[in-house]
Amino acid sequence: MKVGIGTYSFGGIASYLGLGPTLLEKFQTIRDLGFTSVELLPVDLEHDVEDIKKWLSETGLTVTSVHAEPTEEIVKKMAALGGQAVIWAGTPFCSKAEAIEVAHLLDEMAEMAEPYGIKIGYHNHSQEFYFDEGKTLLEHLLDNSTKCYSQLDCGWAQNGGMYPPYFIRKYKNRIVSIHVKENSKVVGPGDRPASRHQEGGPKGSPFANVKELPLEERQKILDGFTAQQNSPEGKKRFEVQCKMGAPESNIDWKEIKKALDEQDFEAFWVVEREGFYDEHDKCLADDCAWLKENIQ
């Protein structure tokens, strides 16, 4: 069982925007906290691949994946770094029909990535567990894709009303990875998600090539996201993320491990923490230590 962490956990949206610690500093902290692998962001891949390789070698880390819209440029870089997957971190879809559209798009991306030995995955939040025509949107997506994998964010799945071990077993050999995120409450998927065809729909990642933006513009974007997260609704979204193994946790991590072990390959685990109950690095170190002591 590989226990990794995403660079997203070191700054959240600020990390997407290339603000805060350098990539090497993040790698050093990740190593010191006890993790052995890392999931990158698009902005991380704006560094020269040879520099990233050097920093990985210096810290003893390996790359598993990147959270990015899968383009051939991104896929090539992930292959050069020895990674396993490019994970689409989310895109709007609100119905069975739109889920099928996304499934076909992901299959096209997967066909592009196959020659490079890279898998294409989709990462969920809670809204993908909205029901339409008898199934959740994420089930419609996977049922209509033959090449796409799931990176099941177990925290958002449980939060949205889906029992992760059930989902993993239903889609055996389709779970390339999981995001480890604690949860203490089932909230549900919310109202019908946004349509990908509404005005201002998907136009590519808002975080693509962010280093080309002036620092002031990036800070303005961050301030907007920070205001959303500090709103009453934003705080409510993350307050359900408790300490790993806490009494209030409603996620059965041991059963998740059993379900994953039934696959024909090893899925990689990525810690992604957005809610902090204590000092930032202590929470992440606790996550890593708890997994190693209780799950491996």
Predicted feature residues:
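Aromatic-rich peripheral "rim/lid" segments of glycoside hydrolase catalytic domains that contact
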Residues: Q263, E274-Q296
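Conserved beta-strand positions
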Residues: I5, L40, W88, Y122, ...
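Acidic-and-aromatic substrate-binding clefts and catalytic sites of carbohydrate-active enzymes
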Residues: I13-G18, S37-E50, H67-I74, F93-I100, ...
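Active-site acidic/histidine proton-transfer and metal-coordination neighborhood
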Residues: L24, Q28, S37, T62-L152, ...
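Acidic/histidine-rich catalytic cores of soluble enzymes
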Residues: P115-M244
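N-terminal pre-domain/capping segments
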Residues: M1-Q84, E114, C288-Q296
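A short, acidic, amphipathic alpha-helical segment used as a generic capping/interface helix at domain edges
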Residues: E248-E262
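Tryptophan-centric aromatic hotspots in well-structured domains and transmembrane helices
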Residues: Y8-F10, F35, Y122, W156, ...
